[in-house]
Amino acid sequence: MQELGLKVMNEKLMYDVLSVPSYTGKERRMRAFIVNYALDKGYLCETDKMGNVYLTKGTLPEGGFYPCLTAHMDTVQLKQVPFIEEDKSLPLETEEMDGQHKIYTKGFGLGGDDKAGIAVALGIMEQMPVCKAVFFVEEEFGCYGSQKTDFTWFENVGYVIAYDAPEYNCASKSCCGVELFDESFYNSYLAELGPKLGLTKFYAHPYTDIMVIRDKTGLACMNFGAGYHNYHTPSEYCIAEEMDKAVSLGIYLINRLGFVRHSIPLEGNKELGATALLFSSNR
């Protein structure tokens, strides 16, 4: 493993997660990795009949609600299936690119969508004393795993942060027309991410598990870039420094949002205009 000098991201964890092969419907290796990792850390770990994984760390303050992180365990990279069946790890390559570090595989498709999101979520969880995380199967099949979850698990959750968007400087304002937050929440907590952390734009996302959570719970939901590029292609790669920034962003947001419940009614809310959600880091 090449040492990269990242600021907050656990580099071993990052490489370990990215080397685990996964494919839609064949998430067993990734599930086993997350479960073993969580048990080693002393987290409460549960799975359901779908194969989704639920983690809880720490004890809430009285009257508090958990921050929750989420990502999905499957990828679209079919060439990873032989590695799954033969219990082998993906051979990772690291090279410098424009002063940063690009992580990829030669010809197998990295599957950073959404293994990078898993690594970022677990990296944030390491840094937080109290946190929940859920990792879903079969997102690429139409969010099948998240649709089958038991949403009573979210009753003590205050808000949900997903990492299932490309690059670092992009985030979702909506998914398939489901608005993830309202203008008041954006102005109070998200607008500052541009000048403080370099998040440059929000956009309309086609679909991901966070829209299912938003629809079922009414909680404020967010979806941020996990540092992957060229997703769903054989040339997919991750930028380690962007994953590092994604961890920093999550830590910052959880400290800002606290252990309170941020509920935003779905009914009557309209999608925010794109122009209201575009801003630059030097604004």
Where does each model-flagged region fall?
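Flexible, glycine/charged-enriched surface loops at secondary-structure junctions
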Residues: E46, L197-A204, G258-G268
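N-terminal capping segment at the start of a domain
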Residues: Q2-G25, H232
